Amino acid sequence: MKAYNVDNFAALIGIDWADKKYDICEHPTSTNKYHYTVVKHRPEALHEWAMDIKQRYPDQKIAIVCELKKGPLIYALAKYDHLTLFTVNPCAVAKYRQAFTPSGAKDDPSDAFLQVEILKLHMDKLSVIEPESAAMRTLSQLVEYRRSLVQDSVDLSNKITATLKNYYPQALEWFKEKDTYIFCDFIQKWPSLIAVKKARKQTLLDFFESHNSHYCTVNNARLDSIKNAMPLTLDEGVIVPNQMLVEVLITQFKVLLKGIEKLDKAIKSAYKAQQDKKIFDSLPGAGPQLAPRLLVAFGSNRARYNDAAELKSTQV
């Protein structure tokens, strides 16, 4: 990893992210001055600011520091050759603020200023954000979005489970795995015990077969359970609202499952194109889900990790 020092840059700039704006502190390294400005959360405004910096410091490098490693701000600034992006741990800024500005008064230095001070004093210890290739960034985003959707599906599955327990708990016993189309389609077709008890035996068997549930013992156990099941409640004041909620949640759940499948296909394709695919495929326990995540964690710029502890802290 290339080592940087303050002398490499014409200016040090700290950027503090807020909901609708970026608070910016600019420190020309040839002076003791600090300039403050605000840029709106708009791509055009950020581009105008970046180009203004380039004009004011022609043919010179500018060091940018912020508390982010990725996100809209990083994506927007990474394309400018005159900017070198550093990241500082938010905890470090918080500790610095607490140590040197304990009053909490309105005239205390901003986080953007504190970031500049940390950059000026500890540049050699900060990580540089070096953009990955477009292919690696694509894979990284896909893996991240898949992880997010999987968590959404877990949360939604828990809501469905909790709602079914209110009026139709037997359905949870008939299907061990909830993140499946057979479970979703069953609930959509027979959203209550009363409804499924009206179904003919052959109709149920055909349903199971059409969803690749071919084990006779499992299907017969389901049929026996359906036949002998007793309603938890006959109170329409409980059944009707909970059934309506389950139907809404199941519809959302199926959309999520299809979305995850779509991302899986995209991840498989993006991962297949990676040069180091064979290396990560060969790792013990690295299957179709884990191998792409490991590759994203390592990235193509592996020199950015100083030790195994830094790599271990990476979320994939």
Model-derived regions, located:
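A detector of single, family-specific signature residues
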Residues: 1-316
